[in-house]
Amino acid sequence: WFHFTGITPAVSDAAIELTEAALKAAKAHNVTVSVDLNFRKKLWSSEKAQKVMTNLMQYVDVCIGNEEDAEKVLGFKPGNTDVTSGELELAGYVDIFNQMADKFGFKYIISSLRESHSASDNGWSACIMDGKTREFYHSRKYHITPIVDRVGGGDSFAAGLICGLVDGKDMKAALEYAVAASA
């Protein structure tokens, strides 16, 4: 398994080249590739992210990213999703995931879902879609309060998902494992 994030190629042009070389090597050896889109506006513009990351998606099997990442990194406009209100409309994710599956042929598309009630009170769940069958699943929701520190939440989510899939869990069980690992 090879995992990378959108942060790595954002660091420099040399990092873009090295990331693509690593992805080519992974694919040449039939290694599953996952990405956490992880857009960081302080590292690069949405325009450059879209140019670079769209090219790298040809190597990706499993794509993790929220609706902002899908828009800023891949150019997909979210439909019925409003994270600023703390209310998440799953239909918006189904729409975005279908667009991503159509364009890139991902095996799985995943997003963590954070409902921010306050800085120390969040709802936490995730959703996944099988890119081939278009089966969509929304995980159990955790109510996290008080939040001690959000640093590393996305990384532990990705690690839990990868662990679940490598261990042979189906997509639903792998997603539940990822959400629990990062809650």
Q: What is each stretch, according to the model?
A:
Residues 1-144:
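Ribokinase/PfkB-type carbohydrate-kinase core domain
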